[in-house]
Regions:
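A glycine-rich phosphate/pyrophosphate-binding beta-strand-loop-alpha-helix module
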Residues: 32-107
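Intein/HINT protein-splicing elements and their conserved insertion hotspots or analogous self-processing inserts
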Residues: 1-18, 22-30, 75-82, 97-210, ...
Length: 286
């Protein structure tokens, strides 16, 4: 969910200082409500940094916006206004500033309009050794949902707790929830083919987006009011949710197959190897 990179240094020098960068944008949410969609976009980008082990208090943002031509229609003007207000509210709540951005306000061609779009990019510094990858690491570990409750007295309390556990070496993997717990668990299972079994007393909607929330694999059980135990990692490469089971390999094939025709990852068996030439003619004034 993030891009992590060491900071560049002079030759013969070394550093363990790195940066993590992530984005957030839900086109459906923005079309339904530009204010809430933009607010969620900011939170989604920062939540991914938190899931990677970064401190959200050190994050900065840059925003990219696309909107239809505004003309003289109040409803059209209201869309970017609402979106920017939502993004600003999120920044004030998080204490994270957007230090740059690009406004693309000409998203209209004849009678075609782009949907309201605000993409949040977040970046934060981190020690390279603290970067946390999202795939499940080991069978038999408890998996928790850290609930980012916008209505709580301390909305970022779950993020603070997760960071505390990470600093103590008790977090093995984490993923910021975007499209529901089922999608989250599936993606976390792919990397090491480690399965997941839902707990017997879990009563929640596995296919509803939970902005601000993070699913994490821990090394031990915890008792925290904003952490819900979802289940346990398993050695068997199978995901079991609500009595339904699916092999990880089948889910991975379906997941990768969506864009296989657009961006092929495998060459056909009879595909010839082409020889490419980069020779070009050199023209001079003579």
């Amino acid at each position: 969910q993030v891009m992590a990179a060491l900071f560049p240094v002079e030759p013969e020098q070394e550093t363990d200082q790195a940066s993590v960068m992530a984005w957030g944008c839900d086109p459906d949410a923005l079309s339904a409500d530009p204010y809430q969609g933009a607010k969620d976009a900011v939170y989604a980008s920062v939540a991914k940094l938190v899931a990677a082990g970064a401190d959200y208090r050190k994050a900065y943002l840059t925003l990219q916006e696309f909107f239809e031509k505004l003309r003289d229609e109040p409803t059209r003007w209201g869309k970017p206004f609402a979106a920017l207000l939502g993004a600003l509210d999120a920044q004030l709540e998080l204490g994270c500033a957007a230090i740059g951005g690009k406004d693309s306000m000409s998203g209209t061609f004849h009678d075609l309009d782009v949907p309201p779009t605000l993409i949040s990019f977040a970046i934060a510094p981190i020690q390279a050794g603290e970067v946390l990858s999202p795939e499940f690491k080991e069978a038999g570990h408890p998996v928790y949902l850290f609930v980012g409750d916008a209505l709580a007295e301390h909305p970022m309390a779950a993020w603070d707790k997760l960071r505390e556990l990470h600093k103590a070496g008790k977090v093995k993997a984490a993923w910021a929830v975007e499209h529901g717990f089922a999608e989250t668990v599936m993606n976390m299972s792919f990397g090491n083919r480690i399965g997941f079994a839902m707990g017997p007393d879990v009563d929640t909607n596995w296919y509803t987006p939970w902005p601000r929330s993070i699913v994490a694999e821990l090394t031990e059980e915890i008792d925290f009011p904003l952490a819900i135990r979802l289940g346990t990692t398993t050695a068997e490469p199978v995901i079991t949710i609500g009595g339904d089971s699916a092999p990880i390999d089948e889910l991975l094939a379906l997941n990768e197959g969506v864009l296989e025709d657009v961006y092929p990852t495998r060459a056909g068996e009879s595909a010839p190897a082409r020889t490419l030439s980069w020779d070009c003619l050199l023209y001079t004034s003579d």
